[in-house]
Amino acid sequence: MAVIKEKAECCTLLVDELYGQLPARVYATLFQRGKLSVRLISQFSKLSARQVKNGLCVLQQHNLLFYSVDANSGEAEYSVNHEYAYNLVRTGKILEMVDNSYGPAGRDVMQNLLLLGQTRISDLVAAYQAKINEVNNDDAWLNDKKPELAIKSKAQLNSVLCRLIEAELIDVIHSKTFQSAHEIEKQVHREVMDVYFSNGIKGTKAKIEFEQRVAEGLRKVREESKTLKRKLAQNGGASKRRKLAVGNETNGAPEEEEDLDPALDPRQVIRINYEKCIVELRSRRLVQYVNETLGETTGYVYGQLLKQLTKNISRCKSDPLIDALTPEEKVTPSVTTNEILDKVKTSIDLTLGIGKIPSKSISKSAAERLTPLAPKDKIPFMNQDDSDDDEEDGDYSDSDEEMDTKKENGDAPVARMSRPEQLRQHLLLLAEGHPGFVRHCGEDEWTVDFKPLMENLRATELDSIIEQTSGRQGLRLIRILRTKGKLGEQALQSLSLMRKVDLQQKMLEMRLVGFAHTQEVPRDNKADPKKSIFLWYCDTEQAYSSLIAKCYATMVHCLQVLEVRRQKDKDVLSLAKRTNVKGKEKDMMRDESYARFAKFLKDERLLMAEMMRIDDTLALLQDY
């Protein structure tokens, strides 16, 4: 798959930042030249074969490479896994997400897997056991305070690994893990042709059967990484095992709960599953949107709903070939109100965030409207007329127009509602409005249509960026072009009610940043530019691509500035790394040196925060 220049540069700098210059040089060569053998990498990078192998070893350990063995020469050829390389920038977000969901123990395990790369379970257990033995050795901590361990026993480590494997945040390395999607597809194609179509594909029916068998083969390859999860599912999920233990009069102590989990095969090699991590980060981002727009209580309810819905969602974007299902299999996952209520903590006050208006002022037909089917795929920008949408929403009672808005969220007495009814009010609130965070798909059943929801949020993000870059006038002009299509300058001027000079200046400004484009239409066959008509138009996909490239370029700039600052303050940073200075910089360093060190740390935090903010935009535009 082709990678834009800015992303290739960003991934190379991230590898350099985390793993050093040698792996980064090898990675940059693979980005520039494509699939290469060790001999060719050495030739193009001017590195020795030994250096190349050392660099490849580091990259392979952290799943940053694909490789395949050439059938003719017998040489292994390597190519970049750019998705895993870019996901290195999301390490902090992933650890924070795991900490919130699985506690410090889960965070500690994920952090070690991120640092170590692919790891055999027995090696991970041995490393933790050595650390536990070291801390439990009282003689080693006579004068120092004994550190607190997140993982205190092998049983706890096994239990945490089981939780993370069941959540698909960790998956298993198998024989085809290090083959690219293109190589796997070619291999499955060959196998299907050899087994089922040795005489060739003849006719439409045979072609459909061929595609189905290829999809089935690719699905089997993808499921190989879920072997540990399937074994755990055979013993029942974590909650089921605890319920069975309670039924057998187990006292529910944490140590005994850990012993309920089956021992994992120590020979299995595991790694971080970034696809599932991105699904969890998407849920986290959606909850943040709801917190900002509808309040924290509604956001908490939405978080519990997403947690239930995404249990069996392994990736944000489905593969059109592998995930092609028959109409009978296309069942949208949904959750009931009671299932969500079971997960909501009793300490959460569900009355918060609900409007206080009389029930007679609410249109039941509109509020309780069901939408059994997901909306058809639409381009968000093509539906600009809100009045048409309002007419299609349903029949509203006349009392809606006469509603006393002063009583909303005011001091009017709140009608007594049961806890399930309070929860339903939050869910109905989520189902209303333009983004459509939730769809009321059945009687007390709720689902989320992620594809149209994310399209709407992308459109909102693009509008926000256009407004910040080109102002309100620029956003207004772009919306006119989206609604009306291609327009000449005179027609655009009459619709926008702007002066010609201001219009030309604003459109030129937006053309330079990639939000607006022009098309030349000649009046005759001579195509004389002086006699041609120039039409303005807005290409949304092109605007997305331009914005994504600029985001990568900005991240590259941040990493380059950080490296320049490191070189500038190299003497101070080397002093701060000394064992007798580390942790006591203010006491051990001179005032001038400490001021430089503190300024560097502040600038580093600002640059990292800027990269995280840009990554939020990138994730929304291309990953979610």
Curated annotation (Swiss-Prot):
GO cellular component terms listed in the entry, alphabetical order: RNA polymerase III complex
What lineage does UniProt assign to this protein's organism? Eukaryota, Fungi, Dikarya, Ascomycota, Pezizomycotina
Please cite one Gene Ontology biological process associated with this protein. Answer: DNA-templated transcription
Family, according to the entry, reads as follows:
Belongs to the RNA polymerase beta chain family.
This chain's protein is named DNA-directed RNA polymerase III subunit rpc-3
The record's annotation in InterPro entries points to: POLR3C_WHD (IPR055207), RNA_pol_III_RPC82-rel_HTH (IPR013197), RNA_pol_III_Rpc82_C (IPR008806), RPC3 (IPR039748), WH-like_DNA-bd_sf (IPR036388)
Q: Share what the entry says about its subunit structure, partners included.
A: Component of the RNA polymerase III (Pol III) complex consisting of 17 subunits.
State the residue spans of region: Disordered. 229-260, 373-418
The segment annotated Leucine-zipper runs over: 551-572
